[in-house]
Each structure stands twice: as structure tokens, then as C-alpha cells.
Regions:
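Phosphate-ester processing/binding pockets and catalytic centers
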Residues: 1-190
Length: 190
């Protein structure tokens, strides 16, 4: 979450020469980072981390695994919708202090769009979906990608399921001490 009254132009200016950030391909050395050396990819990853920490933002993550729902997408959708709705209710006074909540989502997963719209629609909050969001156009969208990746790495670490490419990119000590700890400091408390 970012209050648009908090100017972040100077923060963005510091990383203006960096490419569009997408954490997974940076870690796995996939396009467009496939020809980049590890040290250069780590530099970009570290820069988006520092950028994230410098921002006046708050985050909250929801994490689910399909297998926990026996691959029943309707049950999963119901659970996620309920959790998002409860989050909105728990934080209603804070969220309602804004004239409007703008949701930046690229419609990458239709189910997520339905869940967000459903939960917000019954919450009583004034909201709008930003139309035609292109991830490369919004650094905050890229920050959300970074945060999601770190949260996923945190889950994989807790289950001892980090891949070889992830372990090669960032060791467990720095993952916990720097990235997970730093991202968790940005968490909006319920």
C-alpha cells in the first residue's frame, strides 16, 4: 500500500537506469537477464531491495497452496475472498481514510481479479481498478513482484524447498537476515 500523497519520485529517480525488474528471471537467469553475470543480477536484486526499504509503503501477503484445497479452486477462491474481506474489515478505518483505493493489477490471473473485486465490492471501501496496467510502467508493481518473491522464498525456506538456483543466488543466512527481515518490516499489522 502506498499513499499517493507520499512522493516517491526521488526514490524512483535513483533506479531509473535499471531494467524492468522481475525477480524470478533474475534469480533463475532467464530472459532478459540470461546473458547477465551473477554479480550484475545480484546488484539489480539488491537495488530493488534497497528501493523497497526506502519507500513509504506497507505490505500484507496472503499465501495459499492449491494442494491444501485438494485442487478445488472454488474452495480456494472462497477462502481467499474471505481472508481478503476480513483483512479489509480489520483495517477498514485506516483504508477508509483514503479518498479512493486504486488497485494496480495486470489481470494476470482472472481468479485474483474476481477475488479482489468481490472482497472490495462488499467492503464498503471506495476503490477502483487501474486499467491496462503494464508491469514495466510501474516501479511499485515491480516492488510487489519483489515482495511476493521474497515471501515465496520465505515459505520455501521454512519447508526446506529452496531450489539450487535460489540457493546459488542468495544464501540462507542473507535471505533470512536481510531480505526476509527487511520485507517483513514493511508489513501492515492487522
Amino acid at each position: 500500500m502506498h499513499n499517493q500523497n507520499d512522493d516517491i519520485k526521488s526514490n524512483i529517480e535513483k533506479i531509473k537506469d535499471y531494467p524492468i525488474f522481475h525477480a524470478g528471471p533474475i534469480i533463475r537467469r532467464e530472459y532478459p537477464f540470461d546473458n547477465m553475470e551473477m554479480k550484475d543480477r545480484k546488484k539489480i536484486f539488491q537495488s530493488i531491495f534497497i528501493f523497497t526499504l526506502s519507500l513509504p509503503i506497507k505490505i500484507f501477503s496472503f499465501c495459499y497452496e492449491k494442494k491444501d484445497f485438494n485442487d478445488d479452486l472454488l474452495k480456494m477462491q472462497a477462502k481467499i475472498t474471505k481472508d481478503v474481506y476480513n483483512f479489509l474489515l480489520d483495517n477498514f478505518d485506516f483504508l477508509n481514510s483514503f479518498n479512493e483505493i486504486i488497485i494496480y493489477y495486470d489481470n494476470g490471473q482472472n481468479l485474483i481479479t474476481k477475488i479482489l473485486n468481490g472482497a472490495f465490492a462488499i467492503s464498503g471501501l471506495n476503490y477502483e481498478f487501474k486499467k491496462e496496467v503494464v508491469p514495466g510502467s510501474y516501479r511499485l508493481f515491480q516492488v510487489a513482484d519483489f515482495v511476493s518473491t521474497v515471501k515465496l522464498l520465505e515459505i520455501k525456506l521454512s519447508k526446506n524447498e529452496l531450489s539450487n538456483s535460489e540457493l546459488k543466488f542468495v544464501d540462507v543466512y542473507h535471505l533470512k537476515k536481510n531480505y526476509i527481515k527487511g520485507v517483513n518490516k514493511k508489513t501492515l499489522k492487522r
